[in-house]
Amino acid sequence: MYRRSVGVLFVGRNTRWISSTIRCGTSATRPIRSNALNTDSDNASVRVPVGNSTEVENATSQLTGTSGKRRKGNRKRITEFKDALNLGPSFADFVSGKASKMILDPLEKARQNTEEAKKLPRWLKVPIPKGTNYHKLKGDVKELGLSTVCEEARCPNIGECWGGKDKSKATATIMLLGDTCTRGCRFCSVKTNRTPSKPDPMEPENTAEAIKRWGLGYVVLTTVDRDDLVDGGANHLAETVRKIKQKAPNTLVETLSGDFRGDLKMVDIMAQCGLDVYAHNLETVESLTPHVRDRRATYRQSLSVLERAKATVPSLITKTSIMLGLGETDEQITQTLKDLRNIQCDVVTFGQYMRPTKRHMKVVEYVKPEKFDYWKERALEMGFLYCASGPLVRSSYKAGEAFIENVLKKRNMK
C-alpha cells in the first residue's frame, strides 16, 4: 500500500516535475523517471534509496548539476519535511480517532502551560446575556446610532445591567464622542486613533431620546478621550446631560469622563452642568500607572480632577474605580485609598482586571472574592460613602448605582 507522493522540481534545461511514490515503512528503492532530462535515453531512470535524503540529493544533483549551496538548502528542506511527516499522525491514528488528540503545532504545548491558557476561575464566569429588556436596549442603541461602553469594552455585566425585569432598575452606560479614543491604555479594548471622526452633533439629542424611551432610573455617560478637541469634549458631554434632564427629569445622571489633559476649567463645566455623580477612574495604584495607562494620564492629575469637581460643587458625589490583578501590593492599595479620602472622594469600586485580547497587558493575578470583601471593609472603615468590590464589578456597576440612587433620592426628599 502506498500513502505518500513526493514531488521534486529541478531547475535547469528542459525541466519538468519528477515524481516518486514511496512505500511507507520500507527502505526499498523505486525508480524516478523523467522524459525531459537531457540524457542519452528518453526513458532514463535512477534508482534512489527512499530512506536516505543525502543519497537522494546526490543522485539528483548528478542529473541537474545543482550547486553545492543549493544542494545543502534542498537537503535541509527535505529533512525538515520528512521529520514533520514522521511527527504527524499516521493512517492508523486517523482510523482509531487518535489524530484529533495529537498536537501538531509545537508551540501549542507551551501555550497550554501558560497562565493565560488556563481556564478562568469559576467566580469569573457569567451567563449569556438574554431577556426582553436586554434585546430592547440593544435594538434602540443600534437604531439611534449610539455606542455603549458595555459593548465596546466587553463588560461581563451587560446581561445583568441590561436584562433586569424592572426597566427602571436597568442600567446602560452610553459612550459619547464616538467609539474611537485618542489614547492607548494597555488594559482597554476600545479602538484608538490619533484623529477620530468628528463628534455627531445629534448625539446629545439622540442620547436623551434613548433615555426617555427606556425610562431608566439611572444612566451613566462615559466618553473616550478626545485630545484632538480643544475642550476635550467637555461641552458636548455637558450638553448631553442638559438634554437628558429636559426629557427625563427623574433620571439620575452619572458621567465617567477623562482628565481633559489636566484642564480644570473643563472639569468646572462638567461639574456645573446638572449631573448627579462625577466619576473619573484612577484605574490602578500610583507606581503602576505609567505601565497601565497612556503616558498622558497620570495618577496625580486624576486626583486633581476629582478634587476640583468636589470643590466646585460640594453636593456632587465623586467616584472612582480601581482594577486589581495588575501586580499591586496591599500597601499600595491602602495608600491609594488614603489619597482618595484626602480629596473627599465618596465612592470607590474594585474589580478584577481581565485581559481583553492577547495584544493587551497580561493578568498578573486572579484575585479571590475573599480579598475583594476585605477591601470593601477597609474602604468603608476609612469613610467612603459606598464601596462596590468584587471580581466582576466595574466602575459603572448596577449594584453600586442602586445604592447611590437611594442616597440621592433621600437627599432630594430633604
Curated annotation (Swiss-Prot):
Catalytic activity line of the entry: [[Fe-S] cluster scaffold protein carrying a second [4Fe-4S](2+) cluster] + N(6)-octanoyl-L-lysyl-[protein] + 2 oxidized [2Fe-2S]-[ferredoxin] + 2 S-adenosyl-L-methionine + 4 H(+) = [[Fe-S] cluster scaffold protein] + N(6)-[(R)-dihydrolipoyl]-L-lysyl-[protein] + 4 Fe(3+) + 2 hydrogen sulfide + 2 5'-deoxyadenosine + 2 L-methionine + 2 reduced [2Fe-2S]-[ferredoxin]
GO cellular component: mitochondrion
The protein's Enzyme Commission number: 2.8.1.8
Top-level taxon in the UniProt lineage: Eukaryota
Residue ranges of coiled coil: none
UniProt domain Radical SAM core: residue ranges: 164-385
SMART domains: Elp3
Transit peptide, residue positions per record: 1-18
Binding-site list for [4Fe-4S] cluster 2: C181, C185, C188
GO molecular function: 4 iron, 4 sulfur cluster binding; lipoate synthase activity; metal ion binding
One Pfam family this sequence matches: Radical_SAM
Cofactor names: [4Fe-4S] cluster
Region span, Disordered: 51-75
Residue spans of biased composition, Polar residues class: 51-67
The protein's name in its UniProt record: Lipoyl synthase, mitochondrial
Organism: Saccharomyces cerevisiae (strain ATCC 204508 / S288c) (Baker's yeast)
